[in-house]
Amino acid sequence: MGLTSILIAQVLFLGAANSAVVKRWPCSVSPTGPTDPSVAKNCGYWVNDVAKNDQCADLEGYFDISREELVNWNPSLKENCRLQNGHSYCVAASDLTTRSTDSAEEASRMDMATGVEAADLPSPTQGGLAANCNAFYKVKTGDSCWSIINDFGNFSIYDFYRWNPSVGQSCEALYPDYYVCIGVQEQEPPVATPTNPPGPVLSGTPANCNKYHKVLSGDNCWAIANQYGISLDQFYSWNPAVKPTSCQSLLPDYYVCVGVAETPSATATPQPTPQPQQSSSPDQPMPQPILSRLLRILL
């Protein structure tokens, strides 16, 4: 093999390796393809449209998760970890485990601000940042949403996306030198709004809905369900218009249902209590006509 052939082979090899590193998959909070029949029920983030040559190691490296986590969330991969073409796989569930880092090393490379007042917010930040954010991290080149979560280890992927909706559902808009929210101040649960919707609602909203949420730019179905302490199944059942589109028809400035009034159970009408029939007894006086007739016969 000539020198030129060797160089071409090396370039092709490096190109293939680099393409594997930078590859992005379509991601969403709901699967778009077939899933593992035993997939984690609390899965909140999916990788979709897996290709024939994709490997488990590709997903693990890209999403910064371990083989144990990937298999735990997708049990069908346990035998040989072979991905199925066109399938969707869970890459984050609420039991997400995090790896600890050396505290000294972490402190030296973490550029963060905590306990800040509104007037002292770091800059720049992206739109939609959680209003009650009190801890920030300055994004560095090479960071990913997953690496930030694993570095701090005290919040989940769902929290991060809820606090930083502008980064996108697949972390495609995480920009270096911008500050992202990595912690919020505790606040009271959202207060129920009046029974009547205060604005436009999607079709299929149940008549007994008594709690609404106004959709904001950057909201997603999982984040809203998590905010109000309801399951994703409940959210979809109360807002059927968003389910067929995998939450893509969640429209800003519309109101979605996040709570319903309990329907009173039907109460059977009680049957009247039978009254005992009157019957003559030896102690009751004999009717007057009968008594008169007997006296005439005897006399």
From Swiss-Prot:
Keywords: Cell wall, Chitin-binding, Extracellular matrix, Glycoprotein, Repeat, Secreted, Signal, Virulence. Glycans are attached at residue 154. InterPro entries: LysM1-like (IPR052210), LysM_dom (IPR018392), LysM_dom_sf (IPR036779). Residues 266-288 are annotated as: Disordered. It holds the Pfam family LysM. One of its GO terms (molecular function) is chitin binding. It is found in: Secreted; Secreted, Cell wall; Secreted, Extracellular space, Extracellular matrix. One of its GO terms (cellular component) is extracellular region. Residues 266-283 have a biased composition (Low complexity). SMART domains: LysM. SUPFAM superfamilies: LysM domain (SSF54106). Residues 46-91, 135-182, 211-258 form the LysM domain. The keyword Signal applies. Residues 1-19 form the signal peptide. It comes from the Eukaryota. The keyword Secreted applies. Disruption phenotype: Has no significant effects on cell wall chitin content, cell wall integrity, fungal morphology and fungal growth. Does not affect survival in a mouse model of invasive pulmonary aspergillosis. Cell wall chitin of A.fumigatus recruits lung eosinophils during infection and ldpB might have a role in sequestration of chitin and act as triggers of host immunity to dampen host defense. Belongs to the secreted LysM effector family. The LysM (lysin motif) domains are small globular domains involved in binding chitin in eukaryotes. LcpB contains 3 LysM domains. This is Secreted LysM effector ldpB. The lineage of its organism: Eukaryota, Fungi, Dikarya, Ascomycota, Pezizomycotina. The gene is ldpB.
